[in-house]
A protein has these predicted regions:
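Phosphate-ester processing/binding pockets and catalytic centers
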Residues: 1-187
């Protein structure tokens, strides 16, 4: 079932998924109750479980990469290692499309540098990403939110909003939210 059909069947609005505004009740979710927003999150997570994708996420402590140059260098290194370890997988495709919204210059620089270093420049296609236009951009947002929430659980740093959305039971969070994404994670 398509996500739009699932939302309609549940009487939920069909709005482009964006985790932070959804969780905090900002536009375009401002007029929706928390329970409605949680149902929308559940519908989107259900879509993510069924969607055919593989992913890899990276997380860094600010204190370990305070300087922008240090972050860019470390992220590039980690991307190069990941891409090299998975080169056979990526070489199965004629084109590797990179959708990114250029939101953070350091991330953009590391992505371009690592991908251009490991993969053939003719094989990499860069595209601007928009949550309104590309559902995979929304999937990435959901994955990042779940992975960040996992880190917050591990460090006992849940916010009040995190607790309202995901609860405070870490095993339940892992079972109900995180494990479905982890199955799609590339090593």
């Amino acid at each position: 079932m398509a996500m739009e059909e699932d939302l309609a069947r549940k009487g939920l609005p069909n709005l482009p998924f964006h985790a932070s505004p959804l969780m905090y009740g900002k536009e375009p979710y401002r007029d929706l109750e928390m329970e409605t927003r949680k149902k929308m999150l559940a519908s989107f997570e259900s879509f993510c479980r069924r969607a055919p994708f593989r992913c890899k996420s990276f997380a860094y402590k600010r204190s370990e990469v305070e300087e922008p140059e240090l972050f860019t260098a470390r992220f590039k290194r980690d991307l190069v290692v990941f891409l090299t370890d998975n080169l056979e997988y990526f070489q199965n495709f004629d084109r590797v499309k990179i959708y990114y919204d250029n939101g953070q210059r350091m991330v953009t620089a590391a992505l371009h540098s690592a991908l251009d270093f490991v993969l053939s420049k003719d094989a990499v296609l860069y595209r601007m990403a928009s949550a309104r236009e590309y559902r995979l951009s929304r999937v990435a947002d959901c994955i990042c939110t779940l992975k960040l929430t996992d880190i917050k659980f591990q460090r006992s740093e849940l916010t009040e909003t995190d607790a309202k959305v995901f609860g405070t039971n870490y095993p339940a969070f892992r079972k109900n939210h995180l494990k479905h994404i982890q199955k799609k994670e590339m090593l």
